[in-house]
Swiss-Prot record:
NCBIfam families: FlgB. Its main location: other. Keywords: Bacterial flagellum. Belongs to the flagella basal body rod proteins family. GO terms for biological process: bacterial-type flagellum-dependent swarming motility. This is Flagellar basal body rod protein FlgB. It comes from Aeromonas hydrophila. Disulfide bonds: none annotated. The keyword tRNA-binding does not apply. The basal body constitutes a major portion of the flagellar organelle and consists of a number of rings mounted on a central rod. In Gram-negative bacteria, at least four rings, L, P, S and M are present, whereas Gram-positive bacteria lack the L and P rings. The rod consists of about 26 subunits of FlgG in the distal portion, and FlgB, FlgC and FlgF build up the proximal portion of the rod with about 6 subunits each. The keyword Signal does not apply. It is found in: Bacterial flagellum basal body. One of its GO terms (cellular component) is bacterial-type flagellum basal body, rod. Structural component of flagellum, the bacterial motility apparatus. Part of the rod structure of flagellar basal body.
Amino acid sequence: MAISFDKAFGIHQYALSVRSKRAEVLSSNIANADTPGFKARDINFSQALEEAQHQQGFGLATTSEKHFALQSDAPGLTQYRNPLQPDTGDGNTVDVQQERSEFLRNSLEYQTSLEFMNSKISGLLKALKGEQ
């Protein structure tokens, strides 16, 4: 009997990749907080998760990895954020407090998905070894 990793891991395998990409975008925002004209960006998580599932052929069997074009970047899913602070005069829309808060939240959610996947892998290993 074959093990279906899509069923075992659910959406958490896709959530990890989306949260990783979001961490890159948020850290770029923080790094460019003092760059004149820089516009803060973010990723719509639910839309990106749906796209990641689609790109990975969620639930579909493939005979060749050439059948699906996998992309590590998320073009079209990265959106400019509407600034919540007044214009500082340099055109930069990064609110460092908001970016740090979003980065922390994203990190906690990444860690939660990672812990869930670790517990699933541990369960699969126990099943393969015949342990309880």
